[in-house]
Amino acid sequence: MTENVPRRLLPLLGVRGGRSRVTCRFRCGDACYHEAPNTSSNPYFGDIYTAVLSRRGMLQAGAVSIGISALAVSEADPALAGPGHAHGHHGGPHPHPHSRLDFTPVRPNTDDTVTVPRNYAHRVVVRWGDPVVPGAPEFDFANQSAEAQEKQFGYNCDYVSFFPIDSRRALLWVNHEYTNENLMFAGYTDGSTADLEQIKISMAAHGGSVVEIERVGTTGEWRLVTKGRRPYNRRITATTPMKLTGPAAGHPLLRTAADPSGTRVLGMLNNCGGGITPWGTVLTAEENFNQYFVGGEGAPEETKPALRRYGIATSGDTRRGNRRFDRVDERFDLSKHPNEANRFGYIVEIDPFHPHEQPRKRTMLGRFKHEAATIRLTKDRRVAVYMGDDERFDYIYKFVSDKKYRPGSRRHNDTLLDSGTLYVARFTGNSPADQIDGSGRLPDDGAFDGTGEWIPLCDAQRSYVDGFTVAEVLIHTRLAADAVGATKMDRPEDIEASTATGKV
């Protein structure tokens, strides 16, 4: 008979404070401790910025403001769902006139606890291991299994979105970005020595969850619905069947022994940020997918430049410190399946209200370390998606659909992200210095320092990058952006559009 162990807090094993090296190891595979994959000679935003400040004589003027203009888009119609926003005030107990909440901010501290402002409270809505689908077992730290984890709430939440059902019920979508096996399993060292069941549990703890929540009376509190049918609840993991859609689907670079069609893939990995579409689906972003692969040193030579550009090691001991998913699923060994890595690094679209519909990896939005996806409608109701590649010295992207959004037309809107134009940003700072005087008057060149341009990479039928087909642009997006002179950035993450002007 198995003894039930009481639910307890995660053992921290002495790891405390800030962004520790242990966190870096599990979250992004120590990305910042390796050479940046972008070895191009493209201009760096920091150099452009410094040159702008120098021209304006910052030290003499005392203040500088740089505006980066981009495609002006109108704010999306009130979406079926959306993340909430609150505005605090840093100067004391009196809120800014435009604040929605009145609170005194929490002072910086190193307390090992969740601290909220005075007169506020916090509650746990859902936690790792909580049952998600009907029939899922209660969490048992000492007796975990992959079968149970596939039905339970995953690990390390990131992006969260809220989808109302009615005035008292809603769905939450939650990304499960990565796993800390050293906290999940007693005595864990690394993937090479881990029990195979532990590796399967880790794979099941990745991905995302859809859970139903409900209001608690009139308290303002929400809680997890734990009884009844819960028809929308589901888990998405590293082994959930998904579709590859868009112009790159079916290309030879996406074909594998297990999927000769190049249109079916199992799972999503390291999902970080995301966004909500006007038609009520969630876009979830695959970020540091490179860390899950081994065997790059044995991959075909012609594939190695692209692997390295995506941060995948092609020399040395690629298995050291790795989670070693390849021990239970050999597709993660690139010496055996070199194209498998090309099937990760996409924006994944999921409809939380259709639990039997497969998630879709939208290749038209490019392949890189997606951090998030900010969706807006243009003035003519096409869909614009703004994206950042969260890697040192990588780029900012934009997608604009060919077709227009149709409210209420689910079938039509499901096609919007498969056809359009993908752009990458190039920033400049070349206005005449003596005409930048702080008055607000445009200089002779018609733009202030700090402007930029969107460079088209491809649309669904045509590549605008010499030497690249459309599919190659969408699969090797970083290399295509290198080729057109995109501006290197400092790990661009979230990108937002002004609700007042529509500019990003």
Tell where the protein language model's regions lie, with residue ranges.
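N-terminal secretory signal peptides
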Residues: 1-53
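N-terminal export signals
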Residues: 51, 57-84
